[in-house]
Amino acid sequence: MPGVCRVGVDVAGGTIIGVVQNGTVFANGSLVSVNNDPVQGHGVGPHAGPVMIAGSKNVFVNGILVCNEGDLATCGHAASGSSNVFVGD
């Protein structure tokens, strides 16, 4: 089972800097990343302003799908995730 992605900790090419969820769900002391969370720009073209694409289909935070380790940003980079907090798909 993949680890949950955390804002300000995990990366998908650049650091996930999410602002989409309203700050209610945490893992390892950091906000859980959700669908459409922005990723820090790390180049040009699709790498300039990517967002996360949640692979989970059944786990939500405030009605928004949760991002897990291995989910992709719109630039194609896979996200890292927690080594000890897991959520289902």
What positions do the PLM features span?
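Intrinsically disordered, low-complexity proline/glycine-rich segments
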Residues: M1-D89
